[in-house]
Amino acid sequence: MRLVPFEIAHGEALLEADLNDDRNRPAPEFGNFMPTLMHEDMAFTAIDNGYLVAAAGIFPLWEGVGEAWFLGASRVGRHQFRIAKLVREGLLRIAEEQGLWRVQAALRSDWPELARWARFLGMKHEGTMRCYGANKLDYERWAWLDGC
């Protein structure tokens, strides 16, 4: 497994293929959001034997604060522990290099397994955001704080 800098083509390929869970597929209302994820040195892609496995990164919101994101291919299940560790290390590295003191994520409420994932990343639950999604689904706000 190797990590490479994220490219728009990686995200598009992941979305066109089978995802690890279809709940991971963004709502069509978001349109082509992939270019907004492109921030130099703030995203990466995991590749195994030439296959895209996952991509993750942090979208900067304002100074010191970013929003974490993740896209996993259907083959992520074969590498779930390795991917989890790589994503945690990668997000923490990005946060440190970019001087972020808050990294947050919005995780679907109807996908309870994501709470375990967020805890593994070192995040704490901050609350439920009702009708947050473009499709009016509820989301949970999770965040990692450094020095606050």
Segments and roles (model prediction):
Residues M1-E29:
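Short amphipathic alpha-helix that is part of the acyltransferase structural core
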Residues M34-I47, Y51-A54, G99:
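A short helix-loop-beta-strand connector motif used in the catalytic cores of GNAT acetyltransferases and
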Residues T45, Y51-P60, G66-W69:
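Conserved beta-strand in the GNAT
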Residues A54, G127-R130:
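A structural microfeature
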Residues G64-I83, E140:
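Conserved acetyl-CoA binding element of GNAT-fold acetyltransferases
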Residues A68, C131-C148:
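C-terminal "cap" of GNAT-fold acetyltransferases
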Residues H79-A95, R116, F120:
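Conserved acetyl-CoA-binding loop-helix of GNAT-fold acetyltransferases
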Residues I94, L100-R119, K124, Y132-G133:
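Conserved beta-strand-loop-alpha-helix junction that forms the acyl-donor binding cleft
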